[in-house]
Amino acid sequence: MQNNEIIKPAKYFSELEKSILLALVEKYKYVLECKKSDARTIALKQRTWQALAHEYNSQPSVSLRDFKQLKKCWENIKARTKKIMAHERREKVKRSVSPLLSTHVLGKEKIASMLPEQLYFLQSPPEEEPEYHPDASAQESFAVSNRELCDDEKEFIHFPVCEGTSQPEPSCSAVRITANKNYRSKTSQEGALKKMHEEEHHQQMSILQLQLIQMNEVHVAKIQQIERECEMAEEEHRIKMEVLNKKKMYWERKLQTFTKEWPVSSFNRPFPNSP
């Protein structure tokens, strides 16, 4: 390779570079994937991408990239992952196998975990209710009479019955299904609330981490400015000392010249006599 040949960065990201990018995006995901679109959040995302690009370029064995290239690569990875997971969702519903299911995507589960709100409907397919077969042999060991089951469940679940109406009493299977649905709904709500609090906490920690990075950069810049001011002051002091030394040497030489031209002994001669 000739010395004057310019080495250009690789056009495509390697698997190693994608892995490093995913690790850094996961580090700042609660800022980069925030759904807010106000000016403060947009500016914060911009600074976060710049900090991420600085960390990325400091890694060994990677090509230098700016934050725009890294952001574009991450958007392409997200779009590809959403497409494949949507296809998997459709295939699960159809109960069929497709060749696309074996498509390899780097860190698909990790990418999905970074997009909880966008891919939630893809990750958690609705639970199917088991069909009720009272005559099935597999359920004989769990079979109980409707009267016994209703007596136990009526202590916890009450259905008001209006007077003057002849509404049939709900069957025990309907009571059990309703109770299970209510329990799952309550559990999912608690899980969603807990997940929301965790995401809010992680987002606050990411913002604090970014603020610390920015404060450190400001302090480093301030120290560098003070060092430059000290160097300038030292240089100015050195120049002033050189000027003063030159003035001192000038007056010393002038004094020596004056002493040679007008020696002190010439002033001690007697005054000449008048004629």
UniProtKB/Swiss-Prot annotation:
Q: Kindly state the tissue distribution recorded for this protein.
A: Expressed in brain.
**Cross-link Glycyl lysine isopeptide (Lys-Gly) (interchain with G-Cter in SUMO2) mapped to chain:** 154
In the UniProt record, does the keyword Protein transport occur? no
Q: Give start-end of the signal peptide.
A: none
Location of the Myb-like domain: 13-78
> Which sequence positions carry the modification called Phosphoserine?
96, 98, 274
Q: Which InterPro entries match?
A: Myb_DNA-bind_5 (IPR028002)
Record's keyword terms, sorted:
Coiled coil, Isopeptide bond, Phosphoprotein, Ubl conjugation
Positions in coiled-coil regions: 211-247
Q: Which Pfam families match?
A: Myb_DNA-bind_5
Kindly indicate whether the keyword Coiled coil belongs to this entry.
yes
Report the family membership: Belongs to the MSANTD3 family.
By what name is this protein known? Myb/SANT-like DNA-binding domain-containing protein 3
Q: Which organism is it from?
A: Homo sapiens
